């Protein structure tokens, strides 16, 4: 590869946050990289994430359409900003399961699937926190004294779909939840 996207990341088309688990796309040559990057720009790549968030939703699905930019208070963080600032960011969410407050976990939790129209830095984490549902284990945008701290944030890139650069075939891949995520869900269901 000719160093597209930087010499330190040959073939990597997009990123996921440091403590997010799951799928990313890596390309083996420039042609594939350019094709996949174009699909990403056209929003034709399917990206679905599974997240465990605090508090229960009172709706089964919805959309967060709120611009994101660097936080004025802390430049290492992102934040929702007024519509005339930052960059467009759209996250669709669907409730997969709701968990009431539990003997071990004192706060109600919700398992959601998030689908991105855009792919801004920390987008799901910022949007979920913005609407009152911070991610479990997220020490940046989450709640203080998070009972899941130290295990990693509960955000998993579960599904990636795209058109193959050479064959034109639509392909979709999925990755199972990591063990710590599955174990927590079992405890919440008990």
Please report, for each region that a protein language model flagged, where it lies by residue.
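RNA pseudouridine synthases
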Residues: 1-190
